[in-house]
Amino acid sequence: MSQISAREDSQSHAARDHWIAERLFDWSGLPTVHLRPTFFSEWLLFPYVRSTIVENGIIDLPYGNGRHAPIAGEDQARVIATILAEPAAHIGKTYTLCGPTELNQAGIAAAITEVLGRKISYQPQTIPQYRECLEKAGYPEFMIQHLCAVAIDYQNGLFSGEDKFIAKLTGKPPMTVQDFVASHRQAFATTSAAGR
């Protein structure tokens, strides 16, 4: 499991490390399949992201008008299980894993709004503002460097794409943002709603 932004010239040290790990597997001669997912749907549950949704009704990430089709962990697990069941046809291949519908952050906020029945908005930050928030939250520098670098990649379209593989391989389309939020509704409950 790598990531969609893995490449030799990545400004993210972590994404470059993923690219290096892919090359090591390729050079090893071991039968390998590389999976490069875009941002997971679970990113919405990441403490910093989730807390701004729950507490403030906003997504405040520095992603500009970039787009991606969030991919749920359980959809990735189905892909992995299917490949492991019959690996021969997949050895040596690299697959990009995306959800079914590409959205910008305003579209993701609208999808969350649709499910939760309360207004969620996208309020983009600058990269320096984002870095400051992550530092205040106590994230390690390696992670902050990665998240800020991939935010620029996101703005530049590196995370874009829609599923052309999962439904065909597994026989089931990947979850939409709405499906994911509905299945994790309790995680997005406000304090007042959770206390009822």
Locate each region found by the language model.
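N-terminal Rossmann-like NAD(P)+-binding domain of SDR-like oxidoreductases, especially those catalyzing
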Residues: 1
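A hydrophobic C-terminal alpha-helical subdomain
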Residues: 128-196
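Oxidoreductase cofactor-interface core, primarily capturing Rossmann-like NAD(P)-dependent enzymes
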Residues: 4-121, 125, 132-137, 142-143, ...
